UniProtKB/Swiss-Prot annotation:
It comes from the Bacteria. Transmembrane segments: none annotated. This is Ribosomal RNA large subunit methyltransferase H. Its main location: cytoplasm. One of its GO terms (molecular function) is rRNA (pseudouridine-N3-)-methyltransferase activity. It is an enzyme of class 2 (transferase). The lineage of its organism: Bacteria, Pseudomonadati, Pseudomonadota, Alphaproteobacteria, Rhodobacterales.
Amino acid sequence: MKLQLCAVGRLRSGPERDLVEDYLARFERTGRPLGLPPVQLLELEDRKGGGMEAEADLIAKAVAPGAALVILDERGRTLSSPEFADHLAHWRDSGRDVALAIGGADGLAPRLRDRADLAMSLGRMVWPHMLVRVMLAEQLYRAATILAGSPYHRV
């Protein structure tokens, strides 16, 4: 299993990058004994300014062949943290590669949304795509702690 986080744009040095790196390091430490691979963070830049369609091309090229494509989209399904952990465990157990995709400021092209195996929402509010990385990295770590039976996730 390979786990990719494909995100449009680059995080500059600062608190958001620090948080993403911290949560992904925590995920790696917690997930390794559970058979979860480290997250491969792919920051994709549309240098030609082609908008959502060009960003969709970059994401499609970055996704491992045959990987389950999970997109973050405001129209997607809202999962609880334990439900997300169940999905992560299922992907791990099936051995299927997974690519989590975060679009740019304008979202994801419809053709990429149509291709997705799962469209996930972090709630009904719209979030800046840079903050979505932090939130998703934290949820990956939280999912690993749920699978490990750690007290990090309290209900």
